[in-house]
């Protein structure tokens, strides 16, 4: 998140979503507790996935912001699918409180996915403008 200083709106939204993600983990732990399950497997899986995602996010390259936006888009949609599956399971086993908690998380993920989707183009264009302004070739093209 700290490397997103050139994209303040993105940085702010990622910081907000980090807070949401912490709440989502707390909700998941509550759901597992309600169902008498251990959270260790869930935590291991979540930490593994987040580690892989984090590695993708931290791979430095000139176009990392574009790659990160695409990875965010993919990951948010993966989380949406996961929550929908968990909600279906809760409906089947009759755990309405768990379903309510998971729906809250699903809504947050859908909102984040929508935000990312709406910002892929503006972030891409901002990146291109920054590259054009910073490179000699880009400045020459802008002067024409």
Which ranges hold each PLM region?
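Amphipathic alpha-helical hairpins
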Residues: 1-144
